[in-house]
């Protein structure tokens, strides 16, 4: 009482009510649990329970080894790449007999393959006794122009002799798929290594013999991105 006037007193936050107090208790409990978990995790890290892996040895822990495209291609070239090309190879004259001037329309015929993102199909082909009519070793992408036995049409058939473009070999292999690689970089590196293999193991040994008038036997792949040109990347190349 103060001067005869009654004064009421309430505890702090009492106006929130019982429900409000309970909600605050739950919130505080959650915060406490979160804090405890953070402290525990920090303690685990500081006690040496996490294995430290040296740079370059991450694969020992993750199981994913460093990708080496050169080793990968070397391991499959003689045992898988060449055998598949030789098995699927179609004589260029057979292709020209049916699709001369409309090579982009072949699709899956002749075991044509392409990647999901690609617009054009790739094919394994062969030639025997094809005469070299022109040699270009000066251009950035060197080629020899070949005369296909029995063919008199306008389609130009060439064989790459370095440097090399396109990915027809990689993309025509049934056992190589983009999903098998970690990223686009590795996918591209495999193609680069394949073209390096072509240079060292296929073209270089016969490079000096590539001259007008010589005849060649070859097995290789090409991408049908033109209706009147076949540019072959060889996996087997013999010069006579």
Regions found by a protein language model. Give the residues of each.
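Sec-dependent bacterial lipoprotein signal peptides
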Residues: 4-9, 13-47
């Amino acid at each position: 009482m103060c001067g005869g006037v009654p004064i009421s007193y309430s505890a702090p936050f009492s106006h929130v009510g019982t429900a409000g107090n309970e909600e605050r208790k739950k919130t505080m409990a959650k915060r406490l649990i979160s804090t405890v978990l953070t402290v525990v995790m920090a303690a685990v890290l500081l006690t040496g329970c996490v294995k430290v892996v040296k740079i370059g040895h991450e694969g020992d822990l993750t199981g994913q080894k460093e990708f080496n495209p050169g080793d990968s291609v070397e391991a499959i070239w003689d045992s898988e790449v060449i055998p598949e090309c030789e098995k699927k190879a179609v004589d260029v004259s057979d292709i020209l007999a049916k699709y001369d001037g409309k090579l982009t329309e072949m699709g899956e015929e002749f075991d044509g393959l392409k990647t999901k993102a690609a617009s054009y199909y790739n094919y394994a082909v062969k030639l025997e006794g094809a005469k070299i009519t022109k040699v270009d070793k000066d251009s950035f992408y060197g080629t020899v122009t070949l005369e296909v036995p029995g063919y008199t049409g306008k389609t130009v058939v060439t064989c790459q002799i370095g440097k090399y473009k396109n990915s027809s070999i990689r993309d025509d292999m049934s056992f190589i798929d983009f999903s098998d690689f970690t990223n686009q970089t590795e996918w591209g590196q495999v193609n680069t290594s394949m073209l390096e293999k072509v240079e060292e193991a296929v073209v270089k040994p016969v490079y000096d013999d590539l001259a007008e008038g010589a005849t060649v036997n070859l097995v290789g792949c090409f991408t049908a991105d033109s209706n009147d040109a076949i540019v072959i990347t060889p996996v087997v190349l013999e010069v006579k």
